[in-house]
From Swiss-Prot:
One of its GO terms (molecular function) is structural constituent of ribosome. This is Small ribosomal subunit protein uS9. One of its GO terms (cellular component) is cytosolic small ribosomal subunit. It comes from Methylobacterium sp. (strain 4-46). HAMAP family: Ribosomal_uS9_B.
């Protein structure tokens, strides 16, 4: 019985010590590398984007090419500019991106996700507006696998009665 009593006392002492920090929100601090850049990884479908941002004039480079040549369609450029517009930080950061996998739409979504995360690493106070718009959430939708006995994931083979 004496051991149970002492273990209970130990548990209560531990709860008392940790009880104050238990309900507090985590404090987000600025995370920069040795070159003064913020780094983040974004994902969408099969695409993975690695994003570095630093203060600058608004130059965006994707896989060592200007964003206008890599993402030729204006809709794709608009997608990856969205976090900057929500945060009112357009033309304030130089952005370097390496993106692999997937198609152009998935890559643009991955860059948007990574850019939003990198902005929160550089300026933690931007976390709430970017989170409110859903840019910090990884989109879990991926392609459904093909099933055997079917032509595609859900499409059946053509059925003939006779």
């Amino acid at each position: 019985m004496a051991t149970l009593q002492s273990l209970a006392d130990l548990g209560q002492a531990n709860k008392a010590a940790l009880g104050t920090a238990e309900n507090e929100a985590p404090v987000h601090v600025q995370k920069l590398d040795a070159h003064g850049r913020a780094y983040a990884t974004g994902k969408r479908k099969d695409a993975v984007a690695r994003v570095w941002i630093k203060p600058g004039s608004g130059v965006i480079t994707v896989n060592d090419r200007p964003v206008e040549t890599y993402f030729a369609r204006p809709v794709l450029r608009m997608i990856l500019q969205q976090p900057l517009q929500v945060a009112n930080r357009a033309d304030q950061y130089d952005i370097v991106v390496t993106v692999t996998g997937g198609g152009l739409s998935g890559q643009a979504g991955a860059v948007r996700h990574g850019l939003a995360k990198a902005l929160t690493h550089y300026e933690p106070e931007l976390r709430s507006p970017l989170k409110r718009e859903g840019f910090l959430t990884r989109d879990p939708r991926v392609v459904e696998r093909k099933k055997y006995g079917r032509k595609k994931a859900r499409r059946s083979f053509q059925f003939s009665k006779r």
